[in-house]
């Protein structure tokens, strides 16, 4: 999984079966939210720079029979793309298509695509637009689906099911990953349940759509397992809510209390970004770049902030997607190196390289100070 240094991808392609590159930082520098002005000729020159680095990489991949994942993240779009297309689904798609067009010209077809965002509405809208754009340009590459930085616990599972399920029930997607801020093995059972319930949830989605009245989806199930039921409801209603065909959700199931079902409905509405009834957390699954105890930190921040309804907090392992995925968050906690943390207020880094032992308290103090000023 290569970021920032294209040469690393060249070396990895000699030894690995598949290499992921990120169009947002493969050639372009990491985003700093700076607006850039280009003439059409200057912009074309930027595309030539991509081709100059990508074609040799593709040739190495051909030689070693290495596959490539072009993995676009909403959080790491380049300033070049953002300046020309805005922070939009169209910009995310174009970031991918610039690379796909080169692959097609070079007759390199061992390509998988992923378009990920922590915002389910952005993720679903963008993947649909990508499919439409690829069809228009006669491209047919497999799609990997995921809601990035989905979080952990029930909320992370529900957010993943809303986004991934919306597309799976439309017949879009070839592979999936449920990204949870938990031990990696916790992701597989959830992903398996999503895949195993595609057909059932597609039928349930039709019934849910037929039920819409007074801006409300009413869905009835008889599942006795709580997680199975919550994933099925999220999958079946995700697209309907993301498309704003309804703004309210009623869930009926004789095996669970009304209070618990209302809580599930609220969680699904929040995952679809319709109604916010609790603090919103964006947190990544962690990887080799995460140099602090992510799970413990999330638990501590949640324990101290869960009463702040509507507040959005990003808790990120590193800078690759951190500042970008948190661009619409109120506050951010981002790994900055071994034992070091940087804190953000919206897009602004307000404290750099804080010792990890102090960082959670510093974040809470920042939030408290800002709230006192309001």
Which role fits each region the language model picked out?
Residues 1, 70, 113, 167, ...:
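Conserved, mostly hydrophobic/aromatic
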Residues 2-98, 223:
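Active-site beta->alpha loop and helix N-cap motifs at the rims of alpha/beta catalytic domains
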Residues 37-50, 54, 82-308, 312-315:
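Catalytic alpha/beta core domains of metabolic enzymes, predominantly
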Residues 320-328, 337:
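A C-terminal functional module that forms or caps the active site or interfaces directly
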Residues 338-341, 349-372:
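Beta-strand/loop-dominated core regions that host nucleotide or nucleotide-derived cofactor-binding catalytic loops
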Residues 16-33, 170-185, 245-258, 335-349:
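Glycine-rich phosphate-binding active-site loops on the catalytic face of alpha/beta enzymes
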Residues 307, 330-331, 340-343:
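Catalytic-core signal marking the mid-to-C-terminal active-site face
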